[in-house]
Curated annotation (Swiss-Prot):
Domain DH: 122-304
SUPFAM superfamilies (alphabetical): DBL homology domain (DH-domain), PH domain-like
Species of provenance: Macaca fascicularis
KW ATP-binding (keyword) present: no
Region (Disordered) residue spans: 20-40, 464-502, 507-526
Matches recorded under InterPro entries: DBL_dom_sf (IPR035899), DH_dom (IPR000219), Endocytic_GEF_Adapter (IPR051480), GDS_CDC24_CS (IPR001331), PH-like_dom_sf (IPR011993), PH_domain (IPR001849), PH_RhoGEF3_XPLN (IPR044129), SOS1_NGEF_PH (IPR055251)
This protein's record includes keyword Endoplasmic reticulum: no
Record field: compositional bias (Polar residues): 466-475
Stretches of the chain forming a coiled coil according to its record: none
Residues that bear Phosphoserine: S47, S70
Protein name: Rho guanine nucleotide exchange factor 3
Gene: ARHGEF3
């Protein structure tokens, strides 16, 4: 299931590599044996590294807390490491690197630190982390442009239009953070301490509204980047960069997703500073105001990003016939969740849960673009029946509770059904693990409850998605009395989901009263 992604950054300390020259004592080797080997001049060796401008190889700042997201973003943000190619060098496996963590107390005069209380030292550490994070962010954004964008444009690996789509407004973000870093350095005293940061943040944070366009573009940017990776030249270039020291084992998308990750971290950073700020400090009021500002900005960008993601996927739905088109899809503004599932025949399906309709599709390529062809008629959420199937209750091929060879049990299935007059559908869908299955169940139940509440129907949903009448206490199945009475046509299907995307989707769902949050994309947008 698609959840919004937030990338994980691992860190290792950068090794100090020094070359020790042998002592000059003793006579030089005069009796060197002559060598008849022909050495190829280095100048004749063409290297991709010569085309990449020099960049400072400093790792990503370690985040104090792991952050999850749903814009995308689904970010989807697990590192998309390319599989090693048979013709590439066999590099020793190594973990993702990040830059060394710098502490305020270790950077500035220890004698001064000893004059401060423990709480004040923690406050200075939090302020320094904010400042250091800005410096690292600026460095990484510049690296993304110099080491990826510019060389790919110069070598015509991608067109300027494609690069503009993938990198979006990244260039415009650099001056914003340079301005904050400059102001934070200006108010830092010679001893390294900072007295007030609240007024600076209150004045600077509103400019983060410009993140709107960058975050809203991430879904389309990620899709285009994934598509371009099928090009051998693009794949080769990105793999070489991944193996180079400057990348710190991070792929291009990690760098492109850094601004979003930084944006959602600001509330945490400011709360940490506020937590160590005394009540009588004038900075406290300004910090509280700054937290309210950034929370409002993040919420607004998250909403707009979700709408952008919803539009993106709606535009890529392919209808086999006019009858498949549904006004509920057209009116949807939020994608609660989506992801790949399998049916009981092992067919991979891509399922979308919009605000009021569930759409089951197959991923296809159309005009060199990844699109989603409707597999069956869209199912209105208000009429959808949901059933959590026990492990072993569904057999591959469609049999229910059948005997399995070698007592093999098929796991992580759930069923969605719908019947309206002569129309009926039943789909057995399989998630790739228990967590993904539960995320799908939660998202569907939340979406149905929201739709029923909006329709003014009092009552609650039970664990299987059936409607309970609070007056009689009886169970009422929407659209049909028994789930088992439904026709089990060849639309029966099992699905497997993308975990990261699902968790983000549900995150977004919990944050929005009107729908489930589709976190990576249904993912939490930011």
């Amino acid at each position: 299931m698609v959840a919004k992604d937030y990338p994980f950054y691992l860190t290792v300390k950068r090794a100090n590599c020094s070359l020790e020259l042998p002592p000059a004592s003793g006579p030089a080797k005069d009796a060197e044996e002559p060598s008849n080997k022909r050495v190829k001049p280095l100048s004749r060796v063409t290297s991709l590294a010569n085309l990449i401008p020099p960049v400072k190889a400093t790792p990503l700042k370690r985040f104090s807390q792991t952050l999850q997201r749903s814009i995308s973003f689904r970010s989807e943000s697990r590192p998309d490491i390319l599989a090693p190619r048979p013709w590439s060098r066999n590099a020793a496996p190594s973990s993702t690197k990040r830059r060394d963590s710098k502490l305020w107390s270790e950077t500035f005069d220890v004698c001064v630190n000893q004059m401060l209380t423990s709480k004040e030292i923690k406050r200075q550490e939090a302020i320094f982390e904010l400042s250091q994070g800005e410096e690292d962010l600026i460095e990484d954004l510049k690296l993304a442009k110099k080491a990826y964008h510019d060389p790919m444009l110069k070598l015509s690996i991608m067109t300027e239009q494609e690069l503009n789509q993938i990198f979006g407004t990244l260039d415009s973000l650099i001056p914003l953070h340079e301005e904050l870093l400059s102001q934070l350095r200006d108010v830092r005293k010679p001893d390294g301490s900072t007295e007030h940061v609240g007024p600076i943040l209150v004045g600077w944070l509103p400019c983060l509204s410009s993140y709107d366009s960058y975050c809203s573009n991430q879904v389309a940017a990620k899709a285009l980047l994934d598509h371009k990776k099928q090009d051998h030249r693009v794949q080769d270039f990105l793999q070489r960069c991944l193996e180079s020291p400057f990348s710190r084992k991070l792929d291009l998308w990690n760098f492109l997703d850094i601004p979003r990750s930084r944006l959602v971290k600001y509330p945490l950073l400011l709360r940490e500073i506020l937590r160590h700020t005394p009540n009588d400090n004038p900075d406290q009021q300004h910090l509280e105001e700054a937290i309210n500002i950034i929370q409002g900005i993040v919420a607004e960008i998250n909403t707009k990003t979700g709408e952008s993601e919803c539009r993106y996927y709606k535009e890529r739905l392919l209808y086999l016939e006019e009858g498949q088109k549904d006004s509920l899809i057209d009116s949807s503004r939020v994608l609660c969740c989506h992801g790949e599932l399998k049916n009981n025949r092992g067919v991979k399906l891509h399922v979308f849960l919009f605000q009021e309709v569930l759409v089951i599709t197959r991923a296809v390529t159309h005009n060199e673009q990844l699109c989603y062809q409707l597999y069956r008629q869209p199912i209105p959420v208000k009429d959808l029946l949901l059933e959590d199937l026990q492990d072993g209750e569904v057999r591959l091929g469609g049999s229910l509770r059948g005997a399995f060879s070698n007592n093999e049990r098929i796991k992580n299935f759930f069923r969605v059904s719908f019947k309206n007059g002569s129309q009926s559908q039943t789909h057995s869908l399989q998630a790739n693990d228990t967590f993904n299955k539960q995320q799908w169940l939660n998202c569907i139940r939340q979406a149905k409850e929201t739709v029923l509440c909006a329709a003014g129907q009092a009552g609650v949903l039970d664990s299987e998605g059936s409607f309970l009448n609070p007056t009689t206490g009886s169970r009422e199945l929407q659209g049909e009395t028994k789930l088992e009475q439904m026709d089990q046509s060849d639309s029966e299907s099992d699905c497997s989901m993308d975990t990261s995307e699902v968790s983000l989707d549900c995150e977004h769902m919990e944050q929005t009263d009107s729908s489930c949050g589709n976190s990576r994309h249904g993912e939490s947008n930011v």
